[in-house]
Amino acid sequence: MEIFSILTEQIALFVIYMLVGVLMVKTQVLNKTTLETISRFVIKLSMPVMIFINTVNGVDRATLFSSASVLGITVLLYVLLFLLTRLLAVLFRIRKDTVQLYQAVSMFGNVGFMGIPIVTSIFPEKGMVYISLFTIIDQLTLWTLGIKLTTPSGNGEPFNPKKLINPATAAIILALIFILGQIPVPGVLNQALTKIGATSTPLAMIYLGGVFCCMNIRDYIGKLEFYGTVLIKMVLFPILFFCLLGPFSISQDIRLTMALISALPTMSSVVMLAKASGADGDYAAGSIFVTTICSIITLPAVSLLFGFLS
C-alpha cells in the first residue's frame, strides 16, 4: 500500500505539472517554438547540472568501490533490456523507421520522477546511494545509446558520433572526477547547482503537458506495442530479473532496488531527445502516457510479488 500511495502522489504531481503545460499552450503563453526552448534549457543545462550534483552529493569514493555491484548489475540490466526491446520490436512488427525509438521508450524508465521516491521510501538509509550509483550508468547509457536510438535511422544520413559528446556525458565524467578525487563542491555553489538541477523535473513535465496539448493522444492509446511494453518489460521482466539476481551474493536491498527500477514506465526525457533529433516525439509521448497510467497498477502488483519471492 505504501508504494501505491507514493505512486498515486507522483501521478498527481505528474498530472498537475502537465496541466500547467496544457494551460500555458491553451492561453498562448507557450507554443511549439517556446516549448523547444524549454527542452533545450533542460537538455543543455538543468538536467546535466542535476546529474552532476546529485551524483556528487549521493556517492563518495568509498561507496563507489564498496557498492560496485550496483554498477555491474545496471550494465547487465541494460544489455538485457536492449535485447528484450529488440525482440519486442520484431514481435509487434514495429516499422523499421520506428524500431530504435520504440527501443528507447521501452528501455529507459522514469527513475527521477518515480524511482527515487519509491526506492528512498523503502530503503531510507541506502536508497539514495543505490539510485545515485545506478544513475551513473543509466545516464551514461541514455546520453550515448539513447541518443543513437532517438536519432532517425531512415533518413539516409549516418549517425554522427559527435552527438555522444554532450553536456550530460560531460556532467557524468566530471562527477566521477570529483568523486574519485574527493573534491568537495563549495557550499554556496552546491546550493545553487542543486536549485538549478531541481528545475529539471517540473520543466520536463510542463514541457510534456504542452506536447500532449499539441498532439492527438487518442492516436497512440490503442497501440498494442505500448501494452506489450507494459506486460513484458514492466511486469514479466522485473520478476525474472529479480529471480536471476537471486543466486548471486548481493544484498536483498540492491536486488529489490534494481528489479523495481526495471519496472518503471517510460522516462520523460526520451520525448525531448526524440524531438531534438527530429524523431517522432509524439510517439514517445504516447508511450509515456500509456505506461505511466498502467504503472499505477503494475508497480504495486510487481512489488507485492517481490515480497512473495523474497
Listing of model-derived features with the role each one plays in the protein:
Residues 1-310:
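Alpha-helical transmembrane segments of multi-pass small-molecule/ion transporters
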